[in-house]
Every structure is written in C-alpha cells, then in structure tokens.
Amino acid sequence: MAPRLGIFLLWAGVSVFLPLDPVNGDQHLPGRFLTPAITSDDKCVFPFIYKGNLYFDCTLHDSTYYWCSVTTYYMKRWRYCRSTDYARCALPFIFRGKEYDSCIKEGSVFSKYWCPVTPNYDQDRAWRYC
C-alpha cells in the first residue's frame, strides 16, 4: 500500500506543476505558477489601442503582469513590460493653458509631483506621478 501511495503522490505533484497548454499573448495568464518573461525584443508602442481603449502606459488589463502592445493597434503582438518601458514625462507640457518644463504639484489631489505623458495634458489627460 505504501509504495502505491508514494507513486500516486509523486504523480499528483508532477501533474500540478507540469505546463499542459502553450500560452500566447491572447490568453489570460494564470499568475499562480508563472513568472513574468519577455516574449520578444520588440519595443512597446505608446499609445496603443486594446479592446477599444487607448493606453499611454503598460497595463494589467486581462493579465496578472504589466504588458504592452508592440503595435499601435493590438494585433496579438505584445510583451511584458520592463522597467524601461513605462511611460516617461513629456517635457515641456501644457497644463490648464500654461507651459511647464518640470513635474508639478498643481492640480494634484494628494499634493504629489506629477507630469503628463503627452505634451498636452489639457487635450489627452494622460499622466503619471514623478
């Protein structure tokens, strides 16, 4: 009885951790057993459109890890984001009709420095904290 139980436990353990299906960028990735990996050397394209939404930065939409499209219109070509991929401040920029050349606190609910990721915040309203 003990050898059979040992073989069963070994089989059950291997079955849990064995990847059974290939994964591509069009699927929702279960984050429990996967770690982020770069899928290609292509660069992120910002802004990009995914499922009708415009993204100016890496996103968690339909994923456990931040990712980006490598085409302007998402066509199942994507990769996980690296630290160098996230949106950068667009300096100088326009906010409430005035031009700025550095991060500002003006307009911040939490009094934190921020900047837009496009040259005209008034038009695009895409921003990030500095």
Curated annotation (Swiss-Prot):
Q: Name one GO biological process term.
A: sperm capacitation
Q: List the disulfide bonds.
A: 44-68, 58-81, 89-115, 103-130
Tissue-level expression reads: Component of seminal plasma.
This chain's protein is named Seminal plasma protein pB1
The record ties this protein, via InterPro entries, to: FN_type2_dom (IPR000562), FN_type2_sf (IPR036943), Kringle-like (IPR013806), Seminal_plasma_PDC-109-like (IPR016356), SP_Capacitation_Regulator (IPR051666)
- Compartments (UniProt record): Secreted
Function of this protein? May form a complex with spermadhesin AQN-1 which possesses phosphorylcholine-binding activity.
